[in-house]
């Protein structure tokens, strides 16, 4: 999203690319019955399929509940749907909230734990697994770990994601670019010293894109890091194993949420996994 200042500008940049892609692959817009977009950050809602309406579009355009590229999903779906006279939807946006009351507690009432995670991917892989084993999704206890640019690990209890780390705001394992959980007093000191920027937006951008593996190794490219690990680079090896260590800890924590009654642990990985890490 570099180089554009608003969601409308970003949508205007991406929309012709999407339409050209569909045309290139022989898909006529008139052949679609509906348009579905990924995301975005709306107010907390249960999992499901939602029609895009004016209120949702206003929240997405104004980034009322957070700024993320996934806000474009509903915006673009609505614009394309309006052009062809078809309905627009979003499915399992990343803010679906099925967490228990106790899971929302953080340590202070002013800072409740929020449910922000890779909901669409987690729900999809969990339901696919349920279909593969011939059981209803709502009859299983599953732990699903999405590992990509962000990492979220969810406890799926009988069809509801009752606890999950917030992959957007610094909760859980560090990732390719994000820091995960950090010591709050050290972060406060860095903020007051303006170590990573003079204002909120500069510091937010730092914590969203300059931490994790980037901070430890100088790159977010898993292929490069994997090659360095294979060549015996001690810095890359320690950082990579550290990320795996933290993800494994998060999986273990979610098993406690499910009372140790776990039918399966599902790993959805979009990052390169080197042989030594396995």
Where are these regions (language model features)?
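Short glycine-rich, Thr/Ser-proximal phosphate-binding strand/loop in the N-terminal lobe
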Residues: 1-9
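Short glycine-rich phosphate-binding loop at a beta-alpha junction
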Residues: 30-40, 89, 259-270
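Residue-level detector of conserved catalytic or cofactor/ligand-binding positions
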Residues: 269-277
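Glycine-rich phosphate-binding loop of actin/hexokinase-like ATP-binding domains
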Residues: 103-193
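Phosphate/ATP-binding catalytic cores across multiple sugar-kinase/actin-like superfamilies
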Residues: 125-128, 241-261
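A mobile "lid/hinge" subdomain adjacent to the ATP/sugar-phosphate binding pocket shared
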Residues: 193-241
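Phosphate/pyrophosphate-binding loops at sites that engage ATP/ADP/AMP, CoA/4′-phosphopantetheine
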Residues: 20-33, 132-135, 251-263
């Amino acid at each position: 999203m570099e180089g554009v200042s608003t969601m409308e500008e970003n949508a205007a940049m991406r929309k012709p690319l999407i339409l050209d892609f569909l045309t290139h692959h022989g898909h006529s817009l008139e052949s679609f019955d509906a348009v579905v977009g990924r995301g975005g950050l709306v107010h907390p809602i249960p999992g499901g399929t939602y029609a895009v309406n004016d209120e949702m579009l206003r929240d997405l355009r104004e980034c009322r509940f957070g700024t993320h590229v996934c806000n474009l999903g509903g915006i673009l779906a609505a614009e394309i749907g309006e052009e062809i006279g078809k309905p627009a939807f979003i499915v399992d946006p990343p803010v679906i909230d099925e967490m228990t009351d106790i899971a929302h507690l953080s340590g202070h009432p002013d800072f409740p734990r929020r449910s922000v995670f890779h909901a669409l991917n987690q729900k999809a892989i969990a339901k696919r697994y349920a279909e593969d084993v011939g059981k209803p999704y709502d009859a299983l206890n599953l732990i699903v770990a999405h590992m990509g640019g962000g990492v979220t690990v969810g406890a799926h209890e009988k069809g509801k994601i009752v606890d999950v780390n917030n992959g957007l705001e610094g909760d859980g394992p560090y990732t390719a670019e994000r820091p995960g959980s950090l010591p709050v007093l050290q972060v406060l000191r860095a903020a007051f010293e303006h170590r990573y920027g003079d204002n909120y937006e500069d510091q937010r951008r730092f914590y969203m894109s300059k931490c994790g593996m980037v901070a430890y190794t100088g790159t977010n490219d898993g292929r490069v890091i994997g090659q360095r690990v294979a060549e015996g680079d001690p810095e890359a090896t320690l950082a990579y194993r550290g990320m795996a260590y933290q993800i494994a800890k998060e999986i273990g924590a979610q098993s406690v949420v499910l009372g140790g009654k776990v039918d399966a642990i599902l790993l959805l990985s979009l990052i390169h996994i080197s042989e030594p890490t396995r």
